[in-house]
Structures are given as structure tokens and as C-alpha cells.
Amino acid sequence: MKKINTAFFNNGASFVKGDVIDYVYARGRRQQVTAMTDLYPVVISTENFKEHADKLAGVEAIFTTWGMPVLETADLDRLPALRAVFYAAGSVKGFAKALLQRRVTVCSSWTANAVSVAEFCLGQVLLACKGYFQNTLDCRTPQRNRQDVAFHGRGVYGEKIAIIGAGQIGRRLIELLRPFRLKILVVDPYLSETEADDLHVQKVTLEEAFREAYVVSNHLPDLPTLQKVLDGKLFDSMRPGATFINTGRGAQVNESELIDVLRRRPDLMALLDVTDPEPTPAGSAFYELPNVQLSSHLAGAHGDEVVRMADTMIEEFRR
């Protein structure tokens, strides 16, 4: 059987040291693509596309990841056989428009990346229920590093956890939380009551979620209409000792109002994996507030986890 003609396309990614293709298609995944297809021997970038274009006319599928070049109409004219792009990463918004207009199938490993985010959030939710983050702050001084003095959370039994947005990540987190005796509140206007029953969750309003839950985890979709929707009034309504987790988008939070609330309410904790802008600029109060923990967009796939994204695209290709 004739193998399908394929090529790796990539411009590299600034946040990955070294070759991003080798990073994502690691542990023999690049070799798998080589073995199961007729792979073009050179990785194609914006810089070398014209040099190789005449030899790419028969390419039927592209494998890629972060750093996929944007192919314009003139570029696609030189790829007449192209039928599919397999993107071992998340959002395709940055490059997919012209491809979709040509009816090229664009596959993404968004679901695989969602697994990593949900697992990250699971760890934070469970630790937040225990009061771990506030407790570690207390334990920095000998006066408060005592079991009868340091902060203790409500624990992982019967507490309310709010998930804002029941998309791919939100639903995966719900699934991961299922073994624990927790009550899951969900804010999502598109979630039907039947779906909520099937997921064993309770639909609530945004105001109810912040007011009732001990941990609130944001998974809203990245839409302009949702910018700054999470405001100071919501944060100020949170229960004593509650925790806000953001692995969604920093722009969805009114950060100046969040800072004001955190200054007035040192009992609250904010775990921010995303801010607006990223990275968090020098001089931001987020660096100074003890009840803020910043991480560098760590929730998504990193390290060994990225191979799952390559596996997802290889499996999709084999279909």
C-alpha cells in the first residue's frame, strides 16, 4: 500500500528550548510518523517554504505543533494535494482560517491538553480544600508554625466546589473530582438540566457559585464578551478562607478589583496560572500579596505530558 505523503511544518516556539518538533514528538513519536508515512526529509518553515515548495505539491498531510506557520492563499496554491493538518497542541485560531476555507481538515490535540489542565486543577482544588496554601504561609514563622495556630481548611469531604464553564477542561475536572465526596456547582448557560443531572452537578448562577463554594475554578471560554466578567463584587462575596483558581484567561478577571479584595481580605487565596498580560508585569501587586500564588501558565501540557498531544494526532491520522 502506498504511504501518504506528509511533512512537518514548524517555525519553532519561543517558550521551548531546542527543536519543538523533537520536544512534542518525543519518545519515538517522530520516528512513528516517519515509519507510517512518506515523510518529507526537511521541516518546513515560513523561511524555507518557497525553497521547497515545488517538492511539496504532493503533500497530503501536515504534522505540526506550537509554531505552525500561517499558510496564506498563495502558499496553499502550491499545496494542491493537502487534505489535513494534525496540530499537536491546543487552539488553532492563529493559523486555521485559510486552511478551513480550502476545506482542509484541521485536527487539534485540544482534548489532550485539557487533560493536563484538569489534572493540574484537581491537585489545586484538593489542596485548597485542606487549606494548604494559607497553611504554608502561616508555617513560614515559628510563632504560627503550630498545629493549633496555623490555618486549616474545611477538608475534602462534603464541600462545595464551583466550576465556571463546562467546556472540555471543566468537564474533565468534574470527572476527576467524581471519586471525592464533594458537591460540584457549575456555571454554564449552555449546560442543560439533563446534562447537569448526567454529570451529577448542580447548575447555579455566577453569583451563587462565588458565594457558596469553598473553591472556585475558572474555565470560561476565551471570548471578548467575557473580559473582566469576574469582578470585585464576586470575589468579595467569597466565603472565609475560600480559594480562587484561574487557569482560564487573565483577561476574564477584573484584576485591579481582585487585588483590592485580596488586600482587604487576607483570608482569601488566589492561585493564578494566567494573568493579563502574561507574563505578569514588574510592579504588579500580584508579586507582593502573600495570598496570591503565581505560576507561569503551567497548567497546560509540559514536559512528558506533551507526548500525549503527539499520540492524539498520530491516532487521529491512523483513522
Residue ranges and their predicted role:
Residues A166-G167:
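Glycine-rich Rossmann-fold phosphate-binding loop(s) that bind the pyrophosphate
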Residues D276, T280-P281, L289-A310, E316:
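Adenosine-phosphate binding glycine-rich loop
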